[in-house]
Amino acid sequence: DSDGTTLNICRAAGPGLNAQSDCMILKYFGHGTQIVAEEASDGKTYIWLNSNASVDKSGEYGDNWSVSRVEFVPGATSDAGYAGETFFLNKDGQYDQQVSIDFGARRLLIGSRRSGVRYFWIFDLDEALALPLKKMTATVTVGSAGSEPVTREIEARDLNDCRVLGGFSVPAGSDKENDVYSYSHQGHEVAGNYVYFYEGNAVETGADSFESKAYVTVFNYSGKIVVPRTEVAAVADKAGLAPRDLRPRAMPRARV
């Protein structure tokens, strides 16, 4: 859950139980487009998510420069904009960095964007975790509508020093019926040797509710399409959702 500045990371103890009783608050980390939960071998739970975000004119934090691996501690609050282990992609000014992990295959995917193009970088997860810490800087804007630039010096891991297993880019399309990435980016996933790219309408309210369009395209690590762009259902079954009391409400705007 997010209000543009704060991410509420909640964990339900079991079916039908209130997740709000097991919640951690992260402030100024970013949009929270992609969040990964890790049940680690040390018995702890870690949350992977975007970090080091800037505030825009609407007061919402996004366009982040890194991802962080944060230990999940119920009741804790972090307001530094990053925490735990932080990873910078550090490639050609690419920002809006979003994480996906296949723990079984030990694959780490970082998605990013720049100048209307989406980029996808795949790493060996264990090699990324073993990168040495080094001092890195991130300049972000905070305060009222981005009025205060802040430069942070952070002990972090530089993914630019990590072996790249695969990488490719996807330019924005214009034909919504046919072009990959002609709708807003809504998420991505790495699974084995493949990357799943999810695009679709931002959340709509009012007359446009439940008229969502959404598509998934599957790529290999070199960017070749192995499963063509396929339409999928996303908040489109109005009749099926209504009995479950799932109704439209205002949401933060989507990132493109």
Predicted regions and their residues:
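Loop/turn-rich, solvent-exposed surfaces of beta-rich toroidal or solenoidal domains
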Residues: 163, 167-243
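Beta-propeller fold detector
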Residues: 18-27, 77-91, 130-176, 225-243
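Asp-box/WD-like beta-propeller blade repeats and closely related beta-sheet repeat scaffolds
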Residues: 28-33, 57-104
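Structural signature of eukaryotic scaffold interfaces centered on beta-propeller domains
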Residues: 1, 31-45, 49-50, 54, ...
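Beta-propeller blade signature
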Residues: 4-16, 59-76, 117-147, 209-226, ...
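N-terminal carbohydrate-binding/catalytic regions of secreted carbohydrate-active enzymes
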Residues: 1-32
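Secondary-structure boundary elements
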Residues: 39-44, 71-80, 101-107, 127-133
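Short glycine/acidic-enriched loop and turn motifs that connect beta-strands
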Residues: 1-4, 42, 52-59, 114-118, ...
